[in-house]
Amino acid sequence: MLKHDLDYLELLSESFPTATEAATEIINLEAILNLPKGTEHFLADIHGEYEAFIHVLKNASGSIRRKVDEVFGGQLRQNQKRELCTLIYYPREKLELVKQSDERMEDWYMVTLNQLIKVCQKAAEKYTRSKVRKTLPPKYSYIIQELLHEDGVNPNKSAYISSIFSSIISTGCADDFIIAISETIQRLVIDHLHVVGDVFDRGPGAHIIMDTLMKYHHFDIQWGNHDMLWMGAAVGNASCMANVVRIALRYANLDTLESGYGINLLPLARFAMDTYADDPCTVFKPKLAQADQTYDDKSVYLISQMHKAISIIQFKLEHQIIARHPEYKMDNRDLFHLVNFTDGTIKLSSGVYPMLDMNFPTVDPADPYALTEQEQNIVDRLMGCFMRSEKLQNHLKCLYRHGSMYLTYNMNLLYHASIPLNKDKSLKKVRVGDKTYAGRELLDKVEEMIRTAYVAPEKSDQRLAAVDYMWYLWCGPDSPLFDKAMMTTFERYFIEDKATHHEEKGYYYVYRQEKAVCEMILKEFGLEGPDTHIINGHVPVKAKKGELPIGAEGKLMLIDGGFSKAYQSSTGIAGYTLIFNSQGLHLVQHEPFSSTRKAIEEMEDIKSITVVREVTSHRMLVKDTDNGHLLSKQVENLKKLLQAYSYGLIKERKK
């Protein structure tokens, strides 16, 4: 045995000072290694739609409904199963409804407690007792453990279980216990959650989604382009901040900014009302959902004025970054100086176009990118709100702690958008700072820049460059989070000709359906073999046009969650999520979610169907997973320690 092995084993012996303790740990770990792997749940592109997100999280993309079917089969009618599922998803709210309609609550409690324990037993069967114990609420831990490990078939045991239920009911704890057991089922059904980008965007509740994630037991995030925009704003990038506010106003979703993070928009509102008092702001009218009755005409007009004000500010701020960084090669996004303020046209490389709006009271034709004193004041005040928002800064910390540009996990490669490629399908070398990087090295370098923007000393050159780069990640042509020739925001507002709105996608989107390309990318990230996959979000799958969520002969899984209602008319569905359990991969297609109220009152679940099933040749065990490989290494080291004890190379220490 080598000396460095002995040095390590000496350290290990401090945790396991006797041969018996080392042997016991080997037995425990080998038992865990032979259990079925835990279930992973993959979501992407939530876009602030918190109600649909929370529902999919609660029903685990139909996994809880499947557990209920497995347990009760034909014993319960479909309506009874729906009622039980609704109770598990929304225990507090469902209990209130039951109390209003059911006078025989004691009988209902007895039946329901029996049903919930059976579902919980099913959800817990793949885990060790120790792991299950850690998921239980402390105040009911002992009693739930007792109930989980009794079968209820033996008459004596059945009477024992009934007596426990009777005690729970008679002491007035039934509601609290039902809530606890329902939430335990939710935790047990999903072992690990992967959010493959874009928590944020136009939806009304990104802050609620982040609050929910921060309470979740195990999760990771692969940053998306909209996440990067918010992260950039939260670390002090004024251009990112202006984009965030503009998008919120464009879709009239101010809840996340105002209610969620306490961002004060009043200074912007006053400025916009004064500056654009006689301006109809027609091209800046917000895009309202058909069912949105929240805003009257006066409110819509004010939002339009604010929308225009922040958009003009954004174009000016973006010029500052473009001027500071010629290496970004984004001069083609500076367009105000191409406007002919005399005849109301703009000259682009593709031609001369009439402008849809020419009322620019804050734009000096001689110096179109200069902020007025009032505009600078608005920027400073808004930036101060973003930097001082305690909740936003806490959510930023969570995004850094649990987030990354990519993740390799159990033979799958997860990233939100793209791996930049050349026309010949090779990995594209992209400049970051003063060097070029491709593939995995590129994503590693990009992540280093993102983290530098958060941890480097304030006002240092290193930090300022990294903060600027976060805006590039939002809209830069070679950004792995964007990967399009340009973002045509200016053209979409001011030019009617839709040909100017086109955003040419990078070669990744052209070639990602090819198996050889996906295998090349997987190999770049250290993954090879038949069971490896790329799991990707970002681009909605247009199911009604025949597009499929699986490509490259099964190597590519596209799981844009389709939570954003804006895309549902073009996709025809509400997107896809993915379940990876011990039996294989299950790609689930969802219909649009109506509302939490309907889910509770009318027991209306999201209609979901499994569209792709990739079943493994054998049931996957913990030992087949990344964590299992680490545990196997621990077993190997413990066996070496046991050998060292038996040969007297290390002396046992009695406690």
Swiss-Prot record:
Transmembrane segments: none
GO biological process: gluconeogenesis
Molecular function as annotated in GO: fructose 1,6-bisphosphate 1-phosphatase activity
InterPro entries documented for this protein: FBPtase_class3, Metallo-depent_PP-like
Pathway where it operates: Carbohydrate biosynthesis; gluconeogenesis
Superkingdom of this protein's organism: Bacteria
Known EC number: 3.1.3.11
Reaction(s) catalysed by this chain's protein: beta-D-fructose 1,6-bisphosphate + H2O = beta-D-fructose 6-phosphate + phosphate
UniProt cofactor(s): Mn(2+)
Keywords, in A-Z order: Carbohydrate metabolism, Hydrolase, Manganese
Annotated SUPFAM superfamilies: Metallo-dependent phosphatases (SSF56300)
Family designation: Belongs to the FBPase class 3 family.
Name of the protein described by the UniProt record: Fructose-1,6-bisphosphatase class 3
Organism this protein belongs to: Porphyromonas gingivalis (strain ATCC BAA-308 / W83)
